[in-house]
Amino acid sequence: MSNLNNLTSKILNDAEEKKKYILADAEAQKDKIISKKTNRAEADKEEIITKANIEAEVKKARIISNAKLSVRNDMLRAKQDVISKVFNEAIEKLQNLSNGDYKYYVISTLDSLELEGTEVIIINEKDKDIFSNEFLEALNKELESKGKKGSITLNMEGKFNGGFILDRNGIQINNTFEALINSLRGELEFEVNKVLFD
């Protein structure tokens, strides 16, 4: 019986040793797994924080860029408004020329157009006093003296604020103040911008 007791005791001791070994191994495995998971969680945390910081920087840069673009666009719009106002004031000044200066503008412009003498000068109703019958007769006489037909006529139905349109057989040459300023605007806008904003 003592052999049986010894055998039982040996089995129990071996089982106890195996249990301790298994528990120690399980504890080591547990610690390894926990350490690995903790390290992974720490790495994930760092990665998430890094990504969040990068996204925050990108978002911040985008917001700043959009704000700068918006300010730039507002400034450009304001500059364009000022430049448009300058050109509109130029049109107003032309509309307020004295009768003598206005006639000089019309005569010098007509001289540069090489008239045939059969054209129609389209003006607005407001300018009919400047383009009187005497003015028209003098213009036609001058054309006749140059060997051209002297039969220019007036049409007072223009829907513009100043200047004139010359109609030559259905082809219209626009010499209104608006057309004059608009044709020069492309050339002058850069210079006006320099004068106003530099």
From Swiss-Prot:
This is V-type ATP synthase subunit E. Disulfide bonds: none annotated. Pfam families: vATP-synt_E (PF01991). One of its GO terms (molecular function) is proton-transporting ATPase activity, rotational mechanism. The lineage of its organism: Bacteria, Bacillati, Bacillota, Clostridia, Eubacteriales. Belongs to the V-ATPase E subunit family. Keywords: ATP synthesis, Hydrogen ion transport, Ion transport, Transport. One of its GO terms (cellular component) is proton-transporting two-sector ATPase complex, catalytic domain. One of its GO terms (biological process) is proton motive force-driven plasma membrane ATP synthesis. Produces ATP from ADP in the presence of a proton gradient across the membrane. InterPro entries: ATPase_E_C, ATPase_V1_Esu.
